[in-house]
């Protein structure tokens, strides 16, 4: 096998769910990936070594903006939140637009509507509505088992009526409420315990959270462990926060209206992130879930992809 030539492909990197560079969750976006061969997509993702890389294609429905394919270092995934927010802002800015906008991004879960709002400081806030309303799975393993996985005490994990639960808005997460922000910071993923208990379960990725009493009743601190997708810890996870919105809304006493929460994630990783989540309820049923945040451009460049002949 000899290298005969190379092709060039433009990319941009952004930090998502933050208003400043070097915070939030890193993302690489290829605005036009049509010429990138299928077999190279996962290799490119691993080269960046970010939580996700997005490859953009013309939409199947011409009324939509783009079709997205989202890759983690482990596999392609049907839906992830921070690539949705980051890609929407990137595509909006790269199109030359400067004001508010609506777009629809085609992802593995289906069409994802996104609203973009221009902020006074020149940045943009993007909010997406989940294509799939929250689906609730079976109860989680015992608090003792979860404590072993998270290097915590069983007492750190809340029980009924706020027990851990599997939730999916397109990508399942085990949502685990903890008693304190201190417990959130203290948690550590024990991979072997995770592998023996959760790896083969429906909701194998873990999202832990606790109310932050210093920031208000609707403010939470969170962390996300995604070992099944080769991401030990993620600094900002829109899809998991969508699940959190579903979890909180399902337990809220309010039967109607819009519920809103703010989540800080990534603090322990040195990449602080802020995610805004909402859920609509009608007659006690969840009718919509939305996740939003800002993003900033960090780098841009050209990937030189070798072409090989045998």
In which residue ranges do the predicted regions lie?
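Active-site proximal loop and beta-alpha junction motif in alpha/beta enzyme cores
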Residues: 2-80, 85-310
């Amino acid at each position: 096998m000899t290298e005969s030539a190379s092709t060039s492909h433009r990319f941009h990197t952004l930090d998502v769910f933050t208003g400043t560079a070097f915070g939030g969750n890193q993302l690489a976006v290829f605005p036009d990936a049509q010429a990138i061969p299928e077999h190279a997509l996962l290799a490119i993702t691993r080269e960046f070594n970010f939580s996700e890389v997005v490859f953009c294609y013309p939409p199947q429905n011409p009324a939509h903006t783009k079709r997205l394919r989202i890759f983690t270092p482990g596999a392609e995934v049907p839906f992830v939140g921070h690539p949705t927010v980051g890609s929407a802002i990137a595509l909006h800015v790269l199109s030359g637009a400067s004001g508010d906008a609506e777009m629809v991004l085609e992802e593995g879960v289906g069409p994802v509507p996104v609203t973009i709002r221009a902020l006074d400081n020149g940045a943009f806030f993007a909010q997406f509505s989940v294509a799939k309303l929250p689906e609730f799975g079976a109860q989680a393993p015992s608090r003792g088992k979860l404590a072993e996985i998270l290097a915590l005490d069983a007492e750190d994990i809340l029980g009924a009526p706020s027990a851990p639960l599997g939730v999916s808005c397109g990508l399942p997460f085990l949502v685990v409420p903890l008693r304190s922000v201190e417990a959130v910071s203290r948690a550590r993923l024990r991979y072997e315990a995770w592998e023996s208990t959760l790896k083969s379960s429906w909701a194998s990725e873990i999202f832990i959270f606790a109310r932050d009493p210093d920031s208000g009743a609707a403010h939470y601190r969170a962390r996300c462990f995604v070992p099944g997708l080769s991401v030990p810890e993620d600094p900002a996870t829109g899809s998991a926060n969508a699940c959190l919105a579903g979890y909180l809304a399902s337990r809220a006493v309010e039967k109607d209206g819009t519920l809103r929460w703010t989540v800080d994630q990534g603090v322990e990783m040195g990449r602080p992130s802020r995610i805004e989540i909402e859920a609509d309820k009608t007659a006690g049923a969840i009718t919509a879930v939305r996740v939003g945040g800002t993003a900033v451009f960090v780098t841009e460049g050209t990937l030189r992809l070798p072409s090989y002949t045998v």
